[in-house]
Amino acid sequence: MPELPEVETTRRGIAPYLEGQRVSRVIVRERRLRWPIPEDLDVRLSGQRIECVERRAKYLLIKAEAGSLIGHLGMSGSLRLVECGLVAAKHEHVDIELESGLALRYTDPRRFGALLWCEDPLRHELLARLGPEPLGGLFDGERLFQLSRGRSMAVKPFIMDNAVVVGVGNIYATEALFAAGIDPRREAGSISRARYLRLAEEIKRILAHAIERGGTTLRDFVGGDGQPGYFQQELFAYGRAGEFCKVCGTTLREVKLGQRASVYCPRCQR
């Protein structure tokens, strides 16, 4: 599933080609995504100038003059730029054609993504209750420490809770906990302030570095320019169960937490 770095990589890839451009038409070949694409999307978006492309959590916000398109890549979705009129392949469900001659093409083999229209995206039910951005000033270790008091849930699902902080998905939660030396099974409320301060810094560092590397390509993800991400070459724990720890040589173990596979080093993480 594309996580925050993959979505931010997509945003950075498509924004220069969309911002300031006017939409000529919208072609929808398949409306049945996680939520149906609005039947009047072509009417609402055609003729409008795109003002900016932003990101909130794992959502892309394409802001036009009279509203915004909320995009989510789901499990296997991607957005890339193609020339208008390029024949669509299977699973290429939507083209947003621009007067520049380029089109933003949405591809989603599993159809778990979304393209929704609204006037004010930050008040939309999908975004209104989200926590702070992990790379912003409102997120730090003190927030993690205070919100964790009295919590018996494991620390990994705790930091993946979008009400606590957005955008820390399975890949980057696994990597941040490894870097901070924290066992993902530990009760959130049992972890000290000092360790949460370290964990928050590792979350920020790893997410920022993953964005620089273009995200993590594990299955279907490519950026807005069609290129894969390269952070998977630097993974220490995620997807490496049964392999040797790159730090101490111990065999990495896997455990299920909140229905997610969690890989950890029993020696490095306590």
UniProtKB/Swiss-Prot annotation:
GO molecular function: 8-oxo-7,8-dihydroguanine DNA N-glycosylase activity; class I DNA-(apurinic or apyrimidinic site) endonuclease activity; damaged DNA binding; zinc ion binding
Entry keyword set: DNA damage, DNA repair, DNA-binding, Glycosidase, Hydrolase, Lyase, Metal-binding, Multifunctional enzyme, Zinc, Zinc-finger
SUPFAM superfamilies: Glucocorticoid receptor-like (DNA-binding domain), N-terminal domain of MutM-like DNA repair proteins, S13-like H2TH domain
Reactions that this protein is recorded to catalyse: Hydrolysis of DNA containing ring-opened 7-methylguanine residues, releasing 2,6-diamino-4-hydroxy-5-(N-methyl)formamidopyrimidine; 2'-deoxyribonucleotide-(2'-deoxyribose 5'-phosphate)-2'-deoxyribonucleotide-DNA = a 3'-end 2'-deoxyribonucleotide-(2,3-dehydro-2,3-deoxyribose 5'-phosphate)-DNA + a 5'-end 5'-phospho-2'-deoxyribonucleoside-DNA + H(+)
Cofactor note (record): Binds 1 zinc ion per subunit.
Organism superkingdom: Bacteria
Chain ranges of zinc fingers (FPG-type): 236-270
Active site as annotated: 2-3, 58, 260
Family matches, as SMART domains: Fapy_DNA_glyco, H2TH
Binding site for DNA: 91, 110, 151
Pfam families per UniProt: Fapy_DNA_glyco, H2TH, zf-FPG_IleRS
GO BP term (any one): base-excision repair
Cofactor: Zn(2+)
CDD domains recorded: EcFpg-like_N
Alphabetical list of InterPro entries matching this protein: DNA_glyclase/AP_lyase_DNA-bd, DNA_glyclase_Znf_dom_DNA_BS, Formamido-pyr_DNA_Glyclase, FPG_cat, MutM-like_N-ter, Ribosomal_uS13-like_H2TH, Znf_DNA_glyclase/AP_lyase, Znf_FPG/IleRS
EC number: 3.2.2.23, 4.2.99.18
Its job: Involved in base excision repair of DNA damaged by oxidation or by mutagenic agents. Acts as a DNA glycosylase that recognizes and removes damaged bases. Has a preference for oxidized purines, such as 7,8-dihydro-8-oxoguanine (8-oxoG). Has AP (apurinic/apyrimidinic) lyase activity and introduces nicks in the DNA strand. Cleaves the DNA backbone by beta-delta elimination to generate a single-strand break at the site of the removed base with both 3'- and 5'-phosphates.
Subunit structure: Monomer.
Family: Belongs to the FPG family.
Protein name, UniProt field: Formamidopyrimidine-DNA glycosylase
High-level lineage: Bacteria, Pseudomonadati, Pseudomonadota, Gammaproteobacteria, Pseudomonadales
